[in-house]
């Protein structure tokens, strides 16, 4: 498998550092608010990376932290009249609700910053002893950026460029504007812990260095997060961990791209900010997950409700095909005929294509293209009378369903019972249109009655009325079947 390594700015062959074992650390949320679709994207990306590595047979240990002490948490807690701990616990709980809906597997280890204060103090002391950090008279501790020669190697920034925009704020006791806080002296009303430098709390960058070093020996295989974390957060993590240990921190640095709204970065100030809950009020969770896979994980992803509706059509098409294929396999008699070799070759090409796409920097969009190839092929087999009644057609359908199930488990989609999913989707789409199911079923029944009475003019009127509502009716031997357009 080739993965893009931000550290070296190129795709590289991924080979675990320790045999079959893969250690992966991803930065988690700062628990002060509901998760937005940017969090959903990052979580889905690393969920699929873990799933795919396990699918390949690797023994993966996945660590994803929770930042449960931070300026944002303290400020929000003060605004709402709760403690920082209460606020963080509330939003960690809400995080799990959202992630479970999106079919995101729990990480193996989910450390919280406040449970690792001794490790953070120890790391800070080591950096001071090695002259990479210094304590100020007021009890802050800063990392000496210029003491670490490789600073900037992840983000490609150099000290001179950083220096030009750096300023020491009034009241700060930095020796250099570039230095960043490892430990912050306590302020009135803030949570704090005892340390050699007095009461205080850890800086954000220190937290991830200390927690990743606790659970993994350096270097570990993969460190991940959103593109916005590469600088300064991940750059500072590298500086801290490598200055303290003299070892490389992580072999691969993997970053997912931004979610954009109309080609602009999502932000509350621009009024284009959507939480996961905002989306799931209108769409099924699997539709959102599917949408997040339609673009390569490193590319910007342009979000819109229109794009989600297109994703909804795609996912409905797949589940409908899975349902039809499963029903077609319920035949009891099959002719001995085989399928043409070129049809079998199409299946093999799709199987190879899916594997090649995933091996090439986890190209989920390309992989899903090959899944649609199989779905189209399943439909073609059903349309060709001699194929759909043959053992060759039956075996091809079985193989296609097995491939879709196997690949769906890796991508976390297409794994539900199709009939159940499509029924839920129908109700979800109706609710979004503001139409009650009872109203639709009443009209469908009235149309059936008109047809029974050979009142075709009335039947057509009702059909047109349903189409106006966005509902299509098909007449089948089993009766009228309606769907949302």
UniProtKB/Swiss-Prot annotation:
A biological-process GO annotation = cysteinyl-tRNA aminoacylation
Q: Which InterPro entries match?
A: Cys-tRNA-ligase, Cys-tRNA-synt_Ia_DALR, Cys-tRNA/MSH_ligase, CysS_C, Rossmann-like_a/b/a_fold, tRNA-synt_1_cat_dom, tRNAsynth_Ia_anticodon-bd
Query: What CDD domains is this protein classified in?
Result: CysRS_core (cd00672)
Report if keyword Ligase is assigned: yes
Catalysed transformations (reactions):
tRNA(Cys) + L-cysteine + ATP = L-cysteinyl-tRNA(Cys) + AMP + diphosphate
Pfam families per record? CysS_C, DALR_2, tRNA-synt_1e
Where Zn(2+) binds, per the record, is at 27, 208, 233, 237
Location of the protein in the cell:
Cytoplasm
The name this protein carries in UniProt is Cysteine--tRNA ligase
* Native source organism of the sequence: Maridesulfovibrio salexigens (strain ATCC 14822 / DSM 2638 / NCIMB 8403 / VKM B-1763) (Desulfovibrio salexigens)
Query: Where is the organism placed in the taxonomic lineage, from the top?
Result: Bacteria, Pseudomonadati, Thermodesulfobacteriota, Desulfovibrionia, Desulfovibrionales
Gene name on record? cysS
């Amino acid at each position: 498998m080739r993965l893009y390594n931000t550290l070296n700015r190129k795709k590289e062959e991924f080979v675990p550092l320790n045999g079959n074992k893969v250690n992966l650390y991803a930065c988690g949320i700062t628990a002060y608010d509901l998760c937005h679709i940017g969090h959903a994207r990052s979580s889905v990306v690393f969920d699929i990376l873990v799933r795919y590595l396990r699918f390949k047979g690797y023994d993966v240990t996945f660590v994803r932290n929770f930042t449960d002490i931070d300026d944002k948490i303290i400020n929000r807690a003060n605004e709402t009249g709760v403690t920082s701990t209460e606020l963080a616990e509330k939003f960690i709980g809400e995080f799990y609700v959202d992630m479970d809906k999106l079919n995101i597997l729990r990480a193996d280890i989910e450390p919280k910053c406040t449970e690792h204060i001794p490790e953070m103090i120890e790391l800070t002391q080591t950096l001071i002893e090695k002259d990479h950090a210094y304590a100020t008279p007021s009890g802050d501790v800063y990392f000496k950026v210029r003491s670490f020669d490789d600073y900037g190697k992840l983000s490609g920034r150099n000290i001179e460029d950083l220096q030009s925009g750096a300023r020491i704020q009034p009241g700060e006791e930095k020796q250099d504007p570039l230095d960043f806080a490892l430990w912050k002296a306590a302020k009135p009303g803030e949570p704090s812990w005892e340390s050699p430098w007095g009461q205080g709390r850890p800086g954000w960058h220190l937290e991830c260095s200390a927690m990743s070093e606790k659970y993994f020996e350096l270097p570990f295989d993969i460190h991940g997060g959103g593109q916005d974390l590469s600088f300064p957060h991940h750059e500072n993590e590298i500086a801290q961990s490598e200055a303290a240990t003299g070892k490389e921190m992580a072999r691969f640095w993997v970053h997912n791209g931004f979610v954009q709204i109309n080609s602009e970065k999502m932000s509350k100030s621009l009024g284009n900010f959507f939480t996961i809950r905002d989306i799931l009020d209108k769409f099924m969770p699997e539709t959102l997950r599917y949408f997040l896979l339609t673009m390569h994980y490193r590319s910007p992803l342009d979000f819109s409700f229109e794009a989600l509706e297109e994703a909804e059509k795609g996912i409905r098409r797949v589940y409908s095909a899975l349902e039809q294929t499963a029903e077609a396999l319920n035949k009891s008699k099959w002719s001995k005929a085989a399928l043409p070799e070129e049809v079998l070759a199409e299946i093999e090409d799709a199987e190879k294509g899916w594997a090649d796409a995933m091996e090439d920097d986890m190209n989920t969009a390309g992989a899903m293209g090959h899944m649609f190839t199989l779905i189209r092929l399943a439909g073609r087999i059903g349309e060709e009378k001699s194929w759909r009644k043959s053992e060759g057609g039956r075996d091809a359908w079985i193989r296609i369903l097995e491939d879709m199930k196997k690949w769906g488990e890796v991508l976390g989609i297409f794994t539900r019972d199709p009939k159940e999913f499509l029924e839920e989707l129908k109700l979800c789409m109706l609710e979004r249109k503001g139409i009650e199911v009872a109203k639709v079923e009443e009209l469908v029944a009235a149309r059936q009655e008109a047809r029974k009475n050979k009142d075709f003019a009335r039947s057509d009127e009702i059909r047109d009325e349903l189409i106006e509502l966005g509902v299509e009716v098909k007449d089948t031997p089993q009766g009228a079947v309606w769907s949302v357009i």
